[in-house]
Amino acid sequence: MSTGFFGDIAKIKYEGPESTNPLAFRHYNPDEIVLGKRMEDHLRFAVAYWHTFVWPGGDPFGGQTFERPWFKDTMDAAKLKADVAFEFFQLLGVPFYCFHDADVRPEGRNFAENTSNLNEIVDHFAEKQAATGVKLLWGTANLFSNRRYMGGAATNPDPDVFAFAAATVKTCIDATQRLGGENYVLWGGREGYETLLNTDLKRELDQLGRFVNLVVEYKHKIGFKGAILIEPKPQEPTKHQYDFDVATVYGFLKKYGLENEVKVNIEQGHAILAGHSFEHELALANALGIFGSIDMNRNDYQSGWDTDQFPNNVPEMALAYHHVLSGGGFKTGGTNFDAKLRRQSIDPEDLLIGHIGGMDCCARGLKAAAKMVEDKALSGPLEKRYAGWNVPEAKKMLDGGFSLDEIEAWVRKADLNPQPKSGRQEYLENVVNRYV
């Protein structure tokens, strides 16, 4: 039954590239076959509960601009919000959604009440999932908004806060498992520091390492089959976060024996904040064997902060999905729209239009990426560039068959005098432009 929030808007359908209907897909056709698989199954779209249904439209200079009938801290309002959310998922035809605990339940007076509220709303979600077929891509705990976490959760100097956060994560993993979630995400928004003057860096890293190990231990104890994901971000809200980027997260995982247990959820906007491109973070995660999922959005390139806008750069999406496809595609992960409306976009249909545009952009990027994979447009030149490493002597250098002395002897015997070869960057950039 309709909540009435979206009026008489019907389910969004694919109408093709020539359509001018703002409430239709021009490029996202869920049943279109791409590289032998349905487009929907490649992209695995998810809606972010927090930005879509919780964010009030405020900024540092002004408060709420969105007026939503569920903006009350009561269970009835939480259930209304859920009803609208699942109606939204059905209108868009997305297969997944994601949430933090604080997005979906009213704030209780204590841990027990928070848990009770979460369990009650999970009951409601389970009914909605059964009725609609929409699934949970991942769940997570909000360990950054409440003032108790102002000094961090896992890295807090107060062990009581560590314990409260750990217990909260347990309840959220339980909720995620009950709802059939395919991943569980950890994002350390307050796991970092504002100043080293009051920070014991080694202690905080050790605390964080133990915290993540506790999560992994509990995952195995209860038989949770999903992936544990860490979402890197360099700063904001803290000045420096310990999950700065993919490379930093991998070093952390190696130090605490977690590199085979935890993967990464990479957000485009966070990559930009860290001084990287989105494709850099994806390529590195693939190279290190820790790629899990993506949060899709974009930042304003002039602002210098995390603006969480819907994606609209097709060439960037094409390169991103080229790395996803080259790594074998999503296993348990997907494309979560961690994006929010601009604060002046106050109409209900704006929520749909923002997601429609993002989904179309990703679909165009995926199709371009798939064609590049089929044609070996990028992998072919790459293989040729590194072909010299296929000769026996080169292989021996890498596999330990040559010492430095033996390498020197080979250089002398073969009278090696290597000459530089073009990297052909401009050619490859032009190749990409042919596909997008």
Swiss-Prot record:
Catalytic activity: alpha-D-xylose = alpha-D-xylulofuranose
Keywords: Carbohydrate metabolism, Cytoplasm, Isomerase, Magnesium, Metal-binding, Xylose metabolism
Gene3D superfamilies found in the cross-reference section: Divalent-metal-dependent TIM barrel enzymes
EC annotation from Swiss-Prot or TrEMBL: 5.3.1.5
PROSITE patterns for this protein: XYLOSE_ISOMERASE
Keyword Transcription regulation: no
Magnesium found in the keyword field: yes
Cofactor binding description: Binds 2 magnesium ions per subunit.
Any GO BP: D-xylose metabolic process
Residue numbers binding Mg(2+): D306, D308
Subcellular location: Cytoplasm
Cofactor: Mg(2+)
Gene Ontology MF term list: magnesium ion binding; xylose isomerase activity
SUPFAM superfamilies: Xylose isomerase-like
A cellular-component GO term for this protein: cytoplasm
NCBIfam families found in the cross-reference section: PRK05474.1, xylose_isom_A
Family to which the UniProt record says this protein belongs: Belongs to the xylose isomerase family.
Subunit structure: Homotetramer.
Protein name (database record): Xylose isomerase
The encoding gene: xylA
